[in-house]
């Protein structure tokens, strides 16, 4: 996408290209990269080019991993390793090689291997399920998920740790990196405690479980066996390595610390979070475009003049507005152009959309910029060395520093999580407007497709989304403000990056549920708009028919046309104001709204034969009765046709712009039908027979978001 930034020449405003990497371009690039890995391309570990997409591919989709074993890479590691062996042989004092750890670095030893064992021993302190046997008391939380990391987090951490070690700054052997990859490739995953890391000297304890697996510590358990939904088999690491013919690797000096001292777990969880955050922030723009259609809003709110010229923040005014504007091309539901009207013609109606639509680019844009900033930071973290000490193989110098301090990850996650809340808040505001008959431009209350007295369809969703956005607000609270001094006050400041990344994944889960709920009601609203459009077309014919039948002998053709248009306008206005009524009552009220127009018309100078006025007025009641009856029958027929699928699985498609691809994915691919068939049949078969529950349909959409099945649809909207 070409972005523009305003400027001026001789005082005349103009726009010029602005070099900015858009969220959309990053999403498309990442999506294509992920697809290549899923198609068989190996993730390359070279210390420089690891991407969020690559981490996602290896962590979630079991993509193969290939080490860059070029002579240069091997030589770099060999030089770094030689520095360590030389220091050991010469008796040089080096942190973690001859000293204790952290606040205990004042101790000394000439036993580096035993020192490594002591390091692993004291870090293997996490709380995990002690047995897989059934409990004799029901737990308050799931014993596994409440204490144990998901496998995808651990797999991502193993990949990132290899990518850091291969840079040659850690003093480890090539064989160590190969062994991690061998374990990863065999789909043997350490069981790692969920809690216990403050991400200060890296994620020490979680990484110690990877080290414990490599040395076949029988106290460390691993997942293994066929991949399946849910938990796999767990066994002691020693048994699993034997089963898969993997030789344990006795660690050499400094290698215990080389594995533990890094930010791999924080970076892994952050990478997985950002992969989904980019998708959801783009999906929010698609939802806003669909919301504009569903609410009969105006495309003009996203006009380039407002955003690319007047206030050209890159992510905000330019990208978000451009995407939404483009998605609304050729929509028959959104107003594509502002139409100037007389002040009396739009009296008592809003002249512009409310804030949730009209200011969506301004609200979404800063979130896009923050997520892009986080993406840059986490990508850099995945391609950095986060050890201490660091080894310069060229000079032989050992540097004592603090690259393990993961505040870069924390900041990235804090801003991402806050952005997710703001996205959720915007979509919540749109959704509450959509289900409210006083705000949704003529849609029925709770988006009921049948008589609203016995159909409260989206009311539960309206309540639930309030709970979701409230939880997002709670989760958006910074984690870093809760940093505590730790480890003998040596780690007096720390990052809590892993905790922050975990909280961000929680936010993503809540936001994806909220978005699934919104997409569900958007599809319902769009179907109702299509139904209304067909109803208005039918109503126009009914009015014309009844005018000719009842008043034809009193009116000329031009008078019939004039009166018909006026009556249709009045009845459309009445329909919008009476959506809380059941169908029959609404049609009676709508037909009754024509009375004044008839009286005004036949009492005007246009109707010249005053002697017939009494006869004409007597026929108005008959006209109202006929129109009300036929309109009620038409509405009932349309409801039956739409709900039964006679109008197709996706009846609103022809009315929509580019957003129809997402709508069709929900309606056709996922099989989520328009709601209301049980209500139309007056629950003759009870609940859950003719249709699944509302929650089951929303769950299908949520799973498509969560599992990445919706990403190809979003990508296709922009390519």
Curated annotation (Swiss-Prot):
Q: Where does this protein have coiled-coil stretches? A: none
**Which family would the database say this protein is a member of?**
Belongs to the PAL/histidase family.
Q: Where is this cross-link: 5-imidazolinone (Ala-Gly)?
A: 200-202
- The modified positions for 2,3-didehydroalanine (Ser) read 201
Q: What does this protein do?
A: Catalyzes the non-oxidative deamination of L-phenylalanine to form trans-cinnamic acid and a free ammonium ion. Facilitates the commitment step in phenylpropanoid pathways that produce secondary metabolites such as lignins, coumarins and flavonoids.
**Active-site residues?**
95 (proton donor/acceptor)
InterPro entries registered for this protein in UniProt: Aromatic_Lyase, Fumarase/histidase_N, L-Aspartase-like, Phe/His_NH3-lyase_AS, Phe_NH3-lyase, Phe_NH3-lyase_shielding_dom_sf
Q: Under what name is this protein listed? A: Phenylalanine ammonia-lyase
Q: In which pathway does it act?
A: Phenylpropanoid metabolism; trans-cinnamate biosynthesis; trans-cinnamate from L-phenylalanine: step 1/1
């Amino acid at each position: 996408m070409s972005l523009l930034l305003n400027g001026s020449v001789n005082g005349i405003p103009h726009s010029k290209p602005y070099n900015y990497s858009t969220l959309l371009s990053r999403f498309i690039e990442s999506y294509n990269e992920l697809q290549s890995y899923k198609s068989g391309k190996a993730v390359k570990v070279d210390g420089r080019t690891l991407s969020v997409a690559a981490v996602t591919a290896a962590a979630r989709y079991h993509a193969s991993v290939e080490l860059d074993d070029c002579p240069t890479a091997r030589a770099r590691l060999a030089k770094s390793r030689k520095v360590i062996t030389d220091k050991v042989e010469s008796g040089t004092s080096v942190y973690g090689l001859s000293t204790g750890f952290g606040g205990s670095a004042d101790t000394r030893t000439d036993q580096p291997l035993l020192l490594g064992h002591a390091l692993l021993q004291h870090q293997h302190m996490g709380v995990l399920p002690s047995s897989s046997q059934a409990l004799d008391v029901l737990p308050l939380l799931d014993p596994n998920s409440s204490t144990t990391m998901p496998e995808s987090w651990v797999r991502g951490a193993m990949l990132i740790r290899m990518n850091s070690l291969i840079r040659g700054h850690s003093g480890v052997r090539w064989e160590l990196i190969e062994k991690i990859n061998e374990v990863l490739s065999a789909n043997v995953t350490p069981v790692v405690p969920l809690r216990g890391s403050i991400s200060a000297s890296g994620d020490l304890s979680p990484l110690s479980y990877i080290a414990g697996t490599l040395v076949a510590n029988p106290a460390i358990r691993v997942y293994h066996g066929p991949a399946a939904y849910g938990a796999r088999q767990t066994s002691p690491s020693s048994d699993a390595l034997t089963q898969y013919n993997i030789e344990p690797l006795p660690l050499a000096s400094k290698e215990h610390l080389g594995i533990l001292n890094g930010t791999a777990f924080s970076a892994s969880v952050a990478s997985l979070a950002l992969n989904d955050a980019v998708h959801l922030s783009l999906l929010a723009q698609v939802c806003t475009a669909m919301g504009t259609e569903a609410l009969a809003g105006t495309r003009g709110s996203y006009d380039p003049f407002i955003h690319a010229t007047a206030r050209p923040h890159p992510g905000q005014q330019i990208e978000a507005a451009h995407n939404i504007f483009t998605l609304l091309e050729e929509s028959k539901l959104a107003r594509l152009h502002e139409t100037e009207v007389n002040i009396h013609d739009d009296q008592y109606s809003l002249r512009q959309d409310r804030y949730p639509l009209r200011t969506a680019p301004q609200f979404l844009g800063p979130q896009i910029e923050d997520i892009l900033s986080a993406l840059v930071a986490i990508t850099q973290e995945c391609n950095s060395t986060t050890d201490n000490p660091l080894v310069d193989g060229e000079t032989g110098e050992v540097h004592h520093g603090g690259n393990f301090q993961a505040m870069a990850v924390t900041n990235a996650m804090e801003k991402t999580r806050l952005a997710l809340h703001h996205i959720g808040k915007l979509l919540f505001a749109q959704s509450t407007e959509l289900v409210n008959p006083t705000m949704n431009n003529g849609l029925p209350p709770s988006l009921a497709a049948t008589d609203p007295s016995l159909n409260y369809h989206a009311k539960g969703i309206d309540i639930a989304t309030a709970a979701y956005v409230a939880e997002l607000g709670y989760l958006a609270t910074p984690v870093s403000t809760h940093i505590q001094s730790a480890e003998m006050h040596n780690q007096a400041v720390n990052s809590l990056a892993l905790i922050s990344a975990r909280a961000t994944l929680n936010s993503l889960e809540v936001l994806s549920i909220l978005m699934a709920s919104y997409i569900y009601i958007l599809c319902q609203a769009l179907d109702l708009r299509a139904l209304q459009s067909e109803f208005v077309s039918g109503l126009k014919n009914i009015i014309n028919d009844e005018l000719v039948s009842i008043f034809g002998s009193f009116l000329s053709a031009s008078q019939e046309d004039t009166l018909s248009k006026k009556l249709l306008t009045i009845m459309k206005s009445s329909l919008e104001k009476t959506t809380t009524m059941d169908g029959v009552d609404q049609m009676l009220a709508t037909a009754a709204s024509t009375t004044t127009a008839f009286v005004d018309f036949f009492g005007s100078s246009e109707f010249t034969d005053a002697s017939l006025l009494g006869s004409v007025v007597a026929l108005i009641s008959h006209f109202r009765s006929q129109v009300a009856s036929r309109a009620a029958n038409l509405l009932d027929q349309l409801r039956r046709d739409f709900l039964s699928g006679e109008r197709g699985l996706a009846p609103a498609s022809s009315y929509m712009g580019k957003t129809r691809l997402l709508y069709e994915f929900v309606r056709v691919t996922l099989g989520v039908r328009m709601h209301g068939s049980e209500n139309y049949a007056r629950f003759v078969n009870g609940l859950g027979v003719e249709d699944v529950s509302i929650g089951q349909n929303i769950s299908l959409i949520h799973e498509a978001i969560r599992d990445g099945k919706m990403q190809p649809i979003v990508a296709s909207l922009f390519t």
